[in-house]
């Protein structure tokens, strides 16, 4: 896979309404990567208008999803 560039996530803009991080693309549109993609360990942002892609540099540990599954929670029994 050939990347146009490598860009730090902190240089992207986050839109809380769409949960997308975006960064300007040379074609005039914007590279996009979703919060969900980052939580899944993805590091590729794509431009929807052209074929360019960039590698997103970020700390994956900051985006790890916390498992709030009740089935793994401890059960407290009151006597």
From Swiss-Prot:
UniProt binding sites for Fe cation: 25, 27, 47, 50
Coarse class of the protein's main subcellular location: cytoplasm
Highest rank taxon of the organism: Eukaryota
InterPro entries: DPH3/4-like (IPR044248), DPH_MB_dom (IPR007872), DPH_MB_sf (IPR036671)
The entry's keywords: Cytoplasm, Iron, Metal-binding, Nucleus, Oxidoreductase
One CC-aspect GO term: cytosol
Domain DPH-type MB: 3-59
Known pathway: Protein modification; peptidyl-diphthamide biosynthesis
Reactions catalysed: [3Fe-4S](1+)-[protein] + Fe(2+)-[Dph3] = [3Fe-4S](0)-[protein] + Fe(3+)-[Dph3]; 2 [3Fe-4S](0)-[protein] + 2 Fe(2+)-[Dph3] + NADH = 2 [4Fe-4S](1+)-[protein] + 2 [Dph3] + NAD(+) + H(+)
Disruption phenotype: Sensitive to sordarin (fungicide), methyl methanesulfonate (MMS, causes DNA breaks), hydroxyurea (HU, ribonucleotide reductase inhibitor), thiabendazole (TBZ), sirolimus (TORC1 inhibitor), thermal stress, and cold. Simultaneous disruption of atf1 exacerbates sensitivity to HU and MMS. Global protein levels are unaffected.
Pfam families reported for this sequence: Zn_ribbon_CSL (PF05207)
Cofactor: Fe(2+)
MF (Gene Ontology): ferrous iron binding; iron chaperone activity; oxidoreductase activity
Subcellular location as annotated: Cytoplasm; Nucleus
Any GO BP: tRNA wobble base 5-methoxycarbonylmethyl-2-thiouridinylation
UniProt similarity note: Belongs to the DPH3 family.
Function (record text): Required for the first step of diphthamide biosynthesis, a post-translational modification of histidine which occurs in elongation factor 2. Dph1 and dph2 transfer a 3-amino-3-carboxypropyl (ACP) group from S-adenosyl-L-methionine (SAM) to a histidine residue, the reaction is assisted by a reduction system comprising dph3 and a NADH-dependent reductase, predominantly cbr1. Acts as an electron donor to reduce the Fe-S cluster in dph1-dph2 keeping the [4Fe-4S] clusters in the active and reduced state.
Subunit structure: Component of the 2-(3-amino-3-carboxypropyl)histidine synthase complex composed of dph1, dph2, dph3 and a NADH-dependent reductase, predominantly cbr1.
UniProt free text on domains: The DPH-type metal-binding (MB) domain can also bind zinc. However, iron is the physiological binding partner as zinc binding impairs the protein electron donor function.
Protein name: Diphthamide biosynthesis protein 3
Organism: Schizosaccharomyces pombe (strain 972 / ATCC 24843) (Fission yeast)
Gene name, Swiss-Prot/TrEMBL: dph3
